[in-house]
Amino acid sequence: MSEFIKPYNDDPFVGNLSTPVSTSSFSKGTSRNLPAYRRGLSPLLRGLEIGMAHGYFLIGPFDKLGPLRGTDVALLAGFLSSVGLIIILTTCLSMYGNVSFTRADSKDPLQTSEGWGQFTAGFLVGAVGGSGFAYLLLANIPVLQTAGLSLFS
């Protein structure tokens, strides 16, 4: 096993291990295509794409595992709860950006206060839109509403 796992770039002081999974071309290609690492993406579009994914998957746990599960208003309560959490997350992202990025001369636009503000705005719009899209899918397609019930009952 020691021939497979070795220090990254043969430098034991880096603190990162080079494994067959972490150094494979598939893993590197997959992580390069994530919006956080994709080159040439503006902060607004980066936030929009990350927000859509988060908003889309946040509604499920609130709907199926929330205190109103099994009631007629569970889906609406799940949607409103996910929007509430999205607003809290957006507030936290905004506070982080105001405190962390004070320089305006960074080469990466996401590392500036203005770029982080665009990212946060994109995140808010994308997350509320993703959560709304998931709500509309679950409200109008009954098969999706009952698909996961066997997992939680």
From Swiss-Prot:
Top-level taxon of the source organism: Eukaryota
Coiled coil: none
Transmembrane domains' residue ranges: 73-93, 119-139
UniProt keyword annotations, A-Z: Chloroplast, Membrane, Photosynthesis, Photosystem I, Plastid, Thylakoid, Transmembrane, Transmembrane helix
Location (main, coarse): plastid
Subcellular location: Plastid, Chloroplast thylakoid membrane
GO CC, alphabetical: chloroplast thylakoid membrane; photosystem I reaction center
SUPFAM superfamilies with a match to the protein in the record: Photosystem I reaction center subunit XI, PsaL
Cysteine pairings via disulfide bonds: none
Pfam families cross-referenced by the UniProt entry: PsaL
GO biological process, one term: photosynthesis
Membrane topology according to the record: Multi-pass membrane protein
Family designation: Belongs to the PsaL family.
Listed name of the protein: Photosystem I reaction center subunit XI
Organism encoding this protein: Pyropia yezoensis
Gene: psaL
